[in-house]
Regions:
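Phosphate-centric recognition/catalysis
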Residues: 4-25, 39
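Cofactor- and metal-binding active-site motifs of prokaryotic enzymes
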Residues: 6-11, 18, 30-31, 136-143, ...
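Conserved mixed alpha/beta catalytic, RNA-binding, or beta-rich assembly cores of soluble enzyme
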Residues: 20-81
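Structural motif
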Residues: 21, 32, 42-44, 87-89, ...
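Flexible, glycine/charged-enriched surface loops at secondary-structure junctions
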Residues: 78-86, 121-127
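Glycine-rich beta-strand-to-loop/alpha-helix junction loops that act as flexible
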Residues: 90-94
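Phosphate/ribose-phosphate-bearing ligand recognition and processing surfaces
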Residues: 95-106
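Divalent-metal-activated hydrolytic enzyme cores
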Residues: 106-176
Length: 176
């Protein structure tokens, strides 16, 4: 890895590199997916929160269907032509006190279905549970490190915690 490229992927974002790179993400109940072409040694990462975009929604990379479609297009544009040469990994989908559990499970189910339909092999999964994850993905080798931790920011548990954080903040300000 001569250039030592790296970036942190936020929820709703997609990143890829045709040069060797480290792609990182921190997730609570979101789901992080990596897809890599084994022959070309290129890959990308998405960080999704919702299983699919509804007709009334503007499609964004927060949604599994949109984000994976975008990542597949990028890989195709970079020369990856066969799903047989691609491999995938799925991480995240944790929950605290059940918050976001169903949504995270729906995301994982949708991701698995898309990979099954496209005949892309899932080589690794680390999903569910009550801990968040910090993920580092090497696009060149496909190696991934996933650290389970309770020490992530509250905002990494969004969108469920967004409401609770706002409520706590208001209650705190009212006591002042």
């Amino acid at each position: 890895m001569s250039k030592n490229l790296s970036c942190i992927i936020q929820a709703g974002h997609l990143a890829y590199s045709e040069d060797p790179a480290f792609l990182c993400a921190i997730c609570g109940n979101g789901v992080v997916v990596t897809v890599r072409d084994r022959l070309l040694c290129i890959g990308g990462m998405i960080h999704v929160v919702y299983p699919k975009s509804e007709p009334e929604d503007r499609p964004t990379n927060f949604h599994v269907d949109t984000a994976l479609g975008s990542l597949f297009k990028v890989l195709l544009d970079l020369g990856s032509s066969s799903n047989n040469d691609r491999e995938a990994q799925i991480f995240g989908g944790g929950h605290q006190n059940g918050l976001g559990k169903k949504r995270a499970e729906d995301c994982v189910r949708k991701i698995r279905k898309i990979f099954k339909d496209k005949k892309i092999k899932i080589v690794s999964e680390d999903i569910g549970g009550s801990l968040g994850r910090k993920i580092i993905f090497n696009t060149y080798t496909g190696e991934t490190a996933a650290i389970k931790t309770s020490r992530i920011r509250r905002m990494d548990w969004l969108p469920e915690w967004e409401h609770l954080i706002g409520v706590k903040r208001i209650a705190y300000l009212q006591r002042q």
